[in-house]
């Protein structure tokens, strides 16, 4: 096992215009303060205020958006980070682990990773993801790229169908088809930060949001040693070279994770479980009393000193006494949140310290709050009650289905851009208006400038005389469409769909 030295992980250099020379503790902290400014002032963070947490298109400001959720995760992440550092200090481990002058960056990386953790999510959350992936699957049929004979390939894009005698190109075709059918919010977050917004964050800060280590073009089973870390796609083919450099800069082995990402993940798990239950009461999906009975019944028999008794029952009893002269709902969720944090944060911090050799190596194949403990059971309780009584509610399901239809519909509306030949689309990009393509010209104008520039830059770097050029060009054209639609807010996507379907002006 390699020696634990966080100076080898908390890399304050950047991809472009990186600070040079040896830096003092204060100078390194200023570099991470610059990261904070870049992140907090970015449009991607602002757009989170109109993206779904659980309830799409919600007008009640008391119900969480992705932004308010991310701010709560940021605070919990800060709490866990401080708890870890405090315990390490008591154990006199800070200097031994190279953290004595890096406590500020340690906290900052965790906080900003938490704030950014959802920036790649499309409109309507997981249903938006499903809509994008289903739409591309119906056209690319990536599963057929594994089959023989080649005549069975149902891919609708002629250039991406497998061809006899072109094995090197066929392998690229397989990768592209698989990659485009595995849109994922975490992978899109990496693409946003590096490629689309060019935030030029420190290597350590980007490492904090690389939650999953599986490439989106992965086919087949994942290694048993990394099955948890690779359970979802973490980055796209378009960012393959950048992630390879990131691994080198952060001393990460293949498919391994950056250590501080486990803290961000735990903060998210703690935050959303309580928040989803609270938002459902705010939405009157169930009453507070009904929620308590749902939790009580799902936990089952318990002793007086059990975790359920100390956390949930304690919050229920205190809220019933109304000692603070506030609404019962407000008091219950205040106590539930405090009780939950007071139990789960120290537990997560200790799990991090106890498993530090594997976490530092990036190979710890679990979440911090995923084990056989009562703390893990408490989180499962919150999640199971939310799945059974919140996500399955008719109002929630109706809005999710509408969101799926909106994203599918927008992809269909913009499909003509993907139907153009390479030469025709190149002409459209260069001239921006081509008389013989009136529909395509107008659709192209609607694409945002940063997304169009990202496409142009990616294609301009390709050798145009290579046989791979048409494949890569089409790949980046599909990415252009996914980037544009996934970057919309819920409300903008909803309004845009209605306008383009001529439902309203």
Swiss-Prot record:
Q: How does activity depend on temperature?
A: Thermostable. Fully active at 60 degrees Celsius.
Name of one Pfam family that matches: HD
Note the superkingdom of the native organism: Bacteria
UniProt note on regulation of activity? Inhibited by the action of reducing agents such as dithiothreitol and 2-mercaptoethanol.
Q: Give the UniProt record's GO annotations in the biological process aspect.
A: dGTP catabolic process
Q: What is its EC number?
A: 3.1.5.1
Q: Identify the cofactor(s).
A: Mg(2+)
pH-related activity note = Optimum pH is 8.2.
The keyword Ribosomal protein is annotated on this UniProt entry: no
GO MF terms, alphabetically ordered: dGTPase activity; magnesium ion binding
Q: Does tRNA-binding appear among the keywords?
A: no
Q: Which SUPFAM superfamilies match?
A: HD-domain/PDEase-like
Recorded catalytic reaction(s): these are: dGTP + H2O = 2'-deoxyguanosine + triphosphate + H(+)
Q: Which UniProt keywords apply?
A: Hydrolase, Magnesium
Which InterPro entries does the annotation name? dGTP_triP_hydro_central_sf, dGTPase, dGTPase-like, dNTPase_1, HD/PDEase_dom, HD_domain
Q: Which PROSITE patterns match?
A: HD
Chain ranges of the HD domain: 66-273
Q: Which NCBIfam families match?
A: dGTP_triPase, PRK04926.1
Function text: dGTPase preferentially hydrolyzes dGTP over the other canonical NTPs.
Similarity annotation = Belongs to the dGTPase family. Type 1 subfamily.
Q: How does it assemble?
A: Homotetramer.
Name of the protein in its database record:
Deoxyguanosinetriphosphate triphosphohydrolase
Query: What's the encoding gene here?
Result: dgt
């Amino acid at each position: 096992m390699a020696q634990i030295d966080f100076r080898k992980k908390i890399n304050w250099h950047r991809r472009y215009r990186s600070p040079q020379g040896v830096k003092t503790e204060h100078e390194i902290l200023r570099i991470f303060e610059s990261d904070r400014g870049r992140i907090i002032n970015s449009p991607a963070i602002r757009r989170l205020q109109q993206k779904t947490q659980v309830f799409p298109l919600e007008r009640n400001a008391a119900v969480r958006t992705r932004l308010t959720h991310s701010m709560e995760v940021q605070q919990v992440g800060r709490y866990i980070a401080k708890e870890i550092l405090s315990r390490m200090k008591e154990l006199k481990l800070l200097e031994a682990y190279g953290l004595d002058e890096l406590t500020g960056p340690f906290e900052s990386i965790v906080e900003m990773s938490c704030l950014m953790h959802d920036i790649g999510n499309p409109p309507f959350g997981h249903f938006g993801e499903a809509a994008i992936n289903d739409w591309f699957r119906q056209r690319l049929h990536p599963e057929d790229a594994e089959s023989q004979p080649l005549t069975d390939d149902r891919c609708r894009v002629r250039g991406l169908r497998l061809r006899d005698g072109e094995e090197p190109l066929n392998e690229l075709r397989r990768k592209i088809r698989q990659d485009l059918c595995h849109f994922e919010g975490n992978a899109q977050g990496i693409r946003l930060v590096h490629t689309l917004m060019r935030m030029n964050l420190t290597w350590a800060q980007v490492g904090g949001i690389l939650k999953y280590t599986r490439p989106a073009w992965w086919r087949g089973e994942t290694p048993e040693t990394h099955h948890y870390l690779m359970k979802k796609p973490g980055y796209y083919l378009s960012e393959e070279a950048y992630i390879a450099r990131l691994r080198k800069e952060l001393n990460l082995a293949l498919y391994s994770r950056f250590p501080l990402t486990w803290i961000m993940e735990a903060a998210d798990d703690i935050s959303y479980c309580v928040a989803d239950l609270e938002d459902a009461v705010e939405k009157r999906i169930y009453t507070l009393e009904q929620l308590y009975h749902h939790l009580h019944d799902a936990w089952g028999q318990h002793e007086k000193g059990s975790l359920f008794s100390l956390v949930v029952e304690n919050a229920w009893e205190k809220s019933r006494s109304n000692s603070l002269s506030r609404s019962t709902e407000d008091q219950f969720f205040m106590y539930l949140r405090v009780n939950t944090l007071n139990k789960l944060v120290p537990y997560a911090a200790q799990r991090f310290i106890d498993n530090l050799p594997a976490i530092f190596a990036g190979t710890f194949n679990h979440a911090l709050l995923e084990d056989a403990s009562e703390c893990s059971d408490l989180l499962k309780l919150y999640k199971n009650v939310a799945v059974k009584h919140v996500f399955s509610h008719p109002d929630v399901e109706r809005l999710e289905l509408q969101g799926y239809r909106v994203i599918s519909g927008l992809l269909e509306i913009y499909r003509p851009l993907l139907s153009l030949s390479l030469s025709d689309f190149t002409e459209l990009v260069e001239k921006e208006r081509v008389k013989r393509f009136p529909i395509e010209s107008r659709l192209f104008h609607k694409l945002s400038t940063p997304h169009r520039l990202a496409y142009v830059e990616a294609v301009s770097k390709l050798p145009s005389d290579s046989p791979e050029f048409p494949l890569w060009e089409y790949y980046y054209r599909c990415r252009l469409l996914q980037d544009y639609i996934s970057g919309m807010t819920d409300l903008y996507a909803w309004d845009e769909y209605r306008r383009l379907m001529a439902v309203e002006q």
